[in-house]
């Protein structure tokens, strides 16, 4: 089914129908285009809507505010989302919670802002408790929301919240966030609200509509944060293209041990082998995987822990590759052993992987030989010339730590923990990692 025509600024997706489509990256951004396309091909995607990149330009032209007519259009799509999910935004008995995420035409991982669990307040948290009979989950979601919203929108330093979290974990003698019980998390919510009051002079906002539009504004503002500007300069991404904003109904990976979150590739991005390459955490939300709160598990472990979900991921990976005709990088959430996809895009890969994937996809009749040649880019070939560790020498040294490769080859230099420090060290002639 093709996307229906839409001359407006907001594009809805859900229930196997989408206003947009995968070819509309300039309008929907990469994330929004992927969500629309996955919805159309029957992948299990939580419903939502994408505010187009054009609105980002209008936002800046309009003195960093969204015009009334676009606010009306967003409000209409919230009503549509309520109908689709059979939940109410701000409803105290059956509340709709949403995520608000950026999504430019070109991938800019981690450069802009995300807010999860939006719509929670002192009343809706009680509705979640009654509906799920899971108070620990409700308070965990609320404390996460307060921290994210306060950091991104209210500009309260997230380290203050982290320090309070660590203090409570120490007091309760637990190592991980997931080990805190409902009473500890409820207490943490009250402490977080005190921090907000102390730092801003105002109570934490309780009106879901107010929360939503402040979050959307914050995502547009994050298009011009220091990280995003630096990234665009590094990768020659034009600043005028703007970012889209994706507002999507929440699915929860932090409801218990049959829930979780993860990221993965449909093939190994390092070797190109045709096998799932992914990691996940149980009883967690999306940011936990990349934040290093706990060490994620290899996808192979899921065959033992959640065999049914592992099978769903394998089947979904096949559908994605068959449709997009390329190796995909995807993000997922598991809620009560049901798989939901939150993002897909063509995955970055090493030179070796690019060559192998291209050749294998020709054999699988997914792409032609001519396409395969174009899939191996000049920089992929250059990677074959990069220095690597001598396998024999590696045996002589003690390994301090391991991780997933962010770039090909081997390198040595001073460690810089942020972009600005890396630039300053580089200007001094230092070799920097």
Which residues make up each language-model segment?
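Nucleotide/phosphate-binding sheet-loop regions of phosphoryl- and nucleotidyl-transfer enzymes
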Residues: 2-398, 418-433
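Short, flexible, surface-exposed loop segments at domain boundaries
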Residues: 400, 408, 412-418
């Amino acid at each position: 089914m093709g996307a229906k025509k839409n001359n407006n600024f907001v594009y809805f997706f859900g229930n196997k129908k989408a206003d947009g489509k995968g070819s509309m990256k300039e309008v929907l951004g990469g994330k929004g285009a992927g969500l629309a396309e996955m919805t159309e091909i029957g992948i299990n995607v939580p419903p939502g809507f994408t505010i187009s990149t054009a609105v980002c330009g209008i936002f800046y032209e309009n003195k960093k505010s969204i015009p009334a007519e676009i606010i009306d259009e967003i409000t209409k799509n919230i009503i549509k989302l309520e109908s689709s999910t059979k939940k109410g935004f701000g409803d105290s008995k059956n509340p709709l919670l949403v995520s608000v995420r950026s999504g430019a035409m070109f991938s800019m991982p981690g450069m802009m802002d995300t807010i999860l669990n939006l719509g929670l307040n002192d009343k809706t948290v009680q509705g979640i408790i009654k509906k799920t009979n899971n108070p620990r989950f409700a308070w965990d979601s609320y404390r996460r929301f307060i921290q994210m919203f306060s950091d991104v929108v209210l500009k309260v330093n997230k380290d203050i919240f982290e320090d309070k979290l660590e203090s409570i974990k120490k007091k309760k003698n637990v190592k991980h966030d997931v080990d805190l019980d409902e009473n500890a998390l409820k207490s943490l919510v009250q402490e977080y609200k005190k921090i907000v009051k102390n730092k801003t002079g105002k109570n934490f906002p309780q009106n879901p509509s107010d929360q939503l539009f402040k979050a959307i504004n914050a995502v547009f503002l994050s298009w011009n944060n220091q990280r995003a500007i630096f990234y665009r300069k590094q990768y020659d991404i034009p600043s005028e293209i703007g970012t889209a904003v994706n507002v999507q109904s929440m699915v929860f990976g932090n409801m218990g041990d049959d829930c979780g979150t993860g990221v993965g590739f449909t093939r190994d991005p390092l070797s190109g082998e045709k096998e799932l390459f992914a990691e996940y955490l149980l009883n967690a939300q999306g940011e936990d995987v990349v934040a290093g709160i706990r060490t994620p598990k290899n996808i192979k472990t899921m065959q033992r822990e959640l065999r049914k979900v592992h099978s769903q991921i394998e089947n979904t990976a096949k559908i994605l590759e068959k449709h997009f005709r390329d190796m995909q990088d995807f993000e997922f959430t598991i809620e009560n052993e049901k798989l939901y996809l939150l993002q897909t895009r063509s995955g970055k890969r090493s030179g070796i992987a690019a060559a192998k994937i291209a050749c294998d996809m020709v054999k699988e009749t997914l792409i032609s030989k001519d396409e395969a040649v174009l899939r191996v880019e000049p920089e992929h070939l250059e990677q074959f010339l990069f220095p690597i560790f001598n396998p024999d020498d590696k045996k002589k040294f003690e390994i301090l730590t391991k991780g997933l490769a962010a770039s090909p080859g081997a390198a040595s230099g001073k460690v810089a923990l942020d972009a600005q420090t890396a630039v300053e060290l580089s200007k001094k002639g230092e070799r920097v990692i």
